[in-house]
Amino acid sequence: MKNKGIDQFRVIAAMMVVAIHCLPLHYLWPEGDILITLTIFRVAVPFFFMISGYYVFAELAVANSYPSRQRVFNFIKKQLKVYLLATLMFLPLALYSQTIGFDLPVGTLVQVLLVNGILYHLWYFPALITGSLLLTSLLIHVSFKKVFWLAAGLYLIGLGGDSWFGLIQQTPIEPFYTAVFHLLDGTRNGIFFTPLFLCLGVLVRKQSEKRSLSKTALFFLISLIGLLIESAYLHGFSIPKHDSMYLFLPVVLFFLFPLILRWHPHRTWKHPGQLSLWLYLLHPYTIAGTHFLSQKISILQNNLINYLVVLILTIGFICLFLRQKHSWFRHKQTTPVKRAVKEFSKTALLHNLQEIQRIISPKTKVMAVVKADAYGCGAKEVAPVLEQAGIDFFAVATIDEGIRLRKNAVKSPILVLGYTSPKRIKELRRYSLTQSIISEGHAVALSQRKVAIDCHLAIDTGMHRLGVTPTIDSILSIFDLPFLTISGVYSHLGSADRLNPDSMIRTQKQIACFDQILLELDQRQISYGITHLQSSYGILNYPDLNYDYVRPGILLTGSLSDTNEPTKQRVSLQPILTLKAQLITKRVVAKGEAIGYGQTAVANQETTVGVVSIGYCDGLPRSLSNQEFCLSYRGQSLPQIGLICMDMLLIDLSHCPTIPIESEIEILTDWSDTAEQVQTITNELICRIGPRVSARIK
């Protein structure tokens, strides 16, 4: 969710930071340096903080879920790495300028590293990291509204240790600030300064669509005037300890940020994020260089010229570096050769999703079942594509499958359809997984753990595999259990894939049982959340049912379990998976020679044999051996010969012996026909693909 205005203003904000460190108007107009450089340009660092709040903390402020927490923790890790890199980068300059030394007391060194940084501009990183940790710990336990007002209170306290310090001197509260200075060296840090602007970023994200542009611009101008008056007063009638924190500064940012969001600049910097970061990081080295040169080049003693030279040199160096970096990566990037791949078609997946949505009720949504690694197609690849396409609920078979999805940044709710031991209940909560209650005993055991979790209640309507007894008293007893929030009710149809009379009678009984339970819950005004009953064949054979969700699995892969079984609703499906492997060698075999293991295949003439790097260990059925099973290369059919080995198979290349080594050979594209050939269902064939087969998005 990049925003061009935000990205381009990053560079402007970095230039403002450079100006603060160069004081360009110092000799030409000292008062202007105070009002412009040390006042207006102070929006720069809070702007960077607000970006973090806007993009990183907005989700955590709404819901304390694993994806939102993980996003924040990953962000903090990244900032720690940048801070470590910057510290190492500026260690020579810090030692040279005597900002730090080898004789520095341990306590002071700790304060420098945790609060100020080893050079004057590096305070930003510990402030951001500390503020992020503080805000995260608060949001996990307290509502955003309370956190916001706490952050605002901390900022007001911080004013007294910054620009308002001159006014609180010789007052009863001065000893408090003396203690703060002793511990933290000031209030421009991650405790008093950063949290409010992170919260403001979140607040703008929540309210961005509600604001009138003209009113926002008007309030921005009014608050900016207030900021200038405040600064003029504080600098004119007191001596601020620092001038980073003003009373009107948060107000200015609150109205400025939405204006930047709606800004659409015509001329833009390339790679603005990297440019602004490196401009912020590197400019002190350029300042040190121009300061040294100013002893011989007197014009550099003019602060404005010095500022412009610092900008030009730093930006020029960064642009050259980035250009060279991207050029180097372009030359270095090569597609790694894989012995075997399952190529996943995003286009086919989205087509299948649209076909499903076409036949279900407009009010019914899709809960994508991605168990068994998305039926062997690769959940890591499939789930993000579906989520981006609007799928807002996923289902898996086990807790570990759910955890893997979470670690691959899937944000939507995830339902665990199978059994999870109550001993793992903390993992359910940690990863924000919704657990199926599969029996009365399971419900009681989960509740006894005294850990609040989200659940869906599975009802055994007649399949007799998983689910609670379909009686209202049994179900109500589960609703009464503490710590279990039941946000959904579902069941599973055992014979929906057949349209013979017995199967249809059984299915109608299950539907009637499920509907009766829902009716009785409604009559008792029990809130049971969402409902779902149909899986893939339930969708095709009973499309007129109206529940909140359907649960397609094999349908999304573009296949049917059994193509010989007719369905009430026809759909146009596209297989999303193509199995490919490399041609790794080829050789000429004389007439009469046995090929491969045993003597099941003997060359009846001189034959060019190719070896392909895939075997039954990778999930290819060995029963396909010598069964007229054909591979293909650019439309050319390549018959499989001999017994399929564990890691390889052999093909007849007599009609196309010039295929280059390391060419990709198509092994399987029509999964349904191949499943029929080996007398199994498509589900099993796809799920057999082994872990050695790499996944790739087409």
Swiss-Prot record:
Pathway: Amino-acid biosynthesis; D-alanine biosynthesis; D-alanine from L-alanine: step 1/1. Residues 32-42, 103-121, 169-183, 238-244, 296-301 are extracellular. It catalyses: L-alanine = D-alanine; L-serine = D-serine. Its main location: membrane. Keywords: Antibiotic resistance, Cell membrane, Cell shape, Cell wall biogenesis/degradation, Isomerase, Membrane, Peptidoglycan synthesis, Pyridoxal phosphate, Transmembrane, Transmembrane helix. This is Serine/alanine racemase. Substrate binds at residues 465, 646. It comes from the Bacteria. The lineage of its organism: Bacteria, Bacillati, Bacillota, Bacilli, Lactobacillales. Its EC number is 5.1.1.-, 5.1.1.1. The active site is at residues 371, 597. Its cofactor is pyridoxal 5'-phosphate. The cytoplasmic C-terminal domain is responsible for the racemase activity. Catalyzes the interconversion of L-serine and D-serine, and L-alanine and D-alanine. L-alanine is racemized at a rate that is 14% of that of L-serine. Together with VanC/VanC1 and VanXYC, required for vancomycin resistance in E.gallinarum strain BM4174. The chain crosses the membrane at residues 11-31, 43-63, 82-102, 122-142, 148-168, 184-204, 217-237, 245-265, 275-295, 302-322.
